[in-house]
């Protein structure tokens, strides 16, 4: 079934998305998602929505949060990178410097500033120049050349999430939110909310 923007606006609102945000995204969802978008068709859309809505804080956040201000927090998150409070000081309240510190020199980030340039972005986050490049090569989306597109509401961001989903989530686990979450998250962080959002999406799509 191909849903129009008004229908998608209502679906997103029923899934707890703020009305202003839903209005900004509705036409994009209407354009990009139809009955044949996913390999399992309509039955897969609720699983997809449940995950991307949780991952993006209900379509409000498409960028990795790298603003830290509490001493000791960086040591807890990246213990191999920060051995002392003194090590942390230049990177507190300095997300660009932090991204270059923790991501520079790996994941294909070889140029100065690549850690920040290719920080986590997207409805399902992609991190690192190698992963942005691979996504561009597999989809044709210009996300390696213009990584900022992954951090902005729009068709590129949604298409990238769909492409990642189709490559990484096998049809055999659809409907099993716990197993799907492990694929998306690497664990089960936020599982209860993901389950609730998947159920809400299922009802809204009916």
Regions found by a protein language model. Give the residues of each.
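Proteins synthesized as precursors that undergo proteolytic processing into mature forms
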Residues: 155-158, 167-171
